[in-house]
Amino acid sequence: MELSLKDASGALEVSEATFGREFNEALVHQVVVAYAAGARQGTRAQKTRSEVSGGGAKPWRQKGTGRARAGTTRGPIWRTGGVTFAAKPQDHSQKVNRKMYRGAIASILSELVRQERLVVVENFSVETPKTKELVAKLKGLELKDVLIVTKEVDENLFLSARNLYKVDVRDVAAIDPVSLVGFEKVLITADAVKEIEGILA
């Protein structure tokens, strides 16, 4: 199959297996959820009654006061007590096989092509790290909410986009399912397309 180039005449020959496969919604959902779960910090921590300091002394004698019996001030019903089912640090990451991950990426790319949200260009760069220059280039391509994917990290491009809302720059090695589905359009260079094909082949 072929992808038309936005900034030049002609088209780019690409693999049907990478850019023309059927959309697998269940797979994409599973991989996106797993990826988002892996980004969770998981460092929350609360103390149980055995971990809260103090509470060793019996607050008042067992009988004769008229009050309910109590043996500690650190039980969960006390204001300064521990938490009944205390949250503990945990790892939220989920295992995703390489084949599943690559399949999800290919499925997303194919759907972007079908929805005409994948914009392929021969080359995309800025001469100096100036936001104004990048904004002008994106305006010429009628792009606002966009993920820019290049074969390798372009420092000028990265610095130019750093202060722009809903614009991100990634190299091929840094793309992930969440970033691909999180933007209205994906602007990708021809070199990056070939690099992705090589990885997903």
UniProtKB/Swiss-Prot annotation:
* Native organism: Colwellia psychrerythraea (strain 34H / ATCC BAA-681) (Vibrio psychroerythus)
What this chain does, per the record?
One of the primary rRNA binding proteins, this protein initially binds near the 5'-end of the 23S rRNA. It is important during the early stages of 50S assembly. It makes multiple contacts with different domains of the 23S rRNA in the assembled 50S subunit and ribosome.
**What are the protein's UniProt keywords?**
Ribonucleoprotein, Ribosomal protein, RNA-binding, rRNA-binding
Q: Recall the GO molecular function terms of this protein's record.
A: rRNA binding; structural constituent of ribosome
Q: Where is this region: Disordered?
A: 43-73
Task: Spell out the InterPro entries in the cross-references.
Answer: Ribosomal_uL4, Ribosomal_uL4-like, Ribosomal_uL4_dom_sf
Q: Which Pfam families match?
A: Ribosomal_L4 (PF00573)
How it assembles, according to the record, is: Part of the 50S ribosomal subunit.
Name of protein: Large ribosomal subunit protein uL4
Q: Which GO terms describe its cellular component?
A: ribonucleoprotein complex; ribosome
What's an example GO BP annotation here? translation
Question: What family, per the record?
Answer: Belongs to the universal ribosomal protein uL4 family.
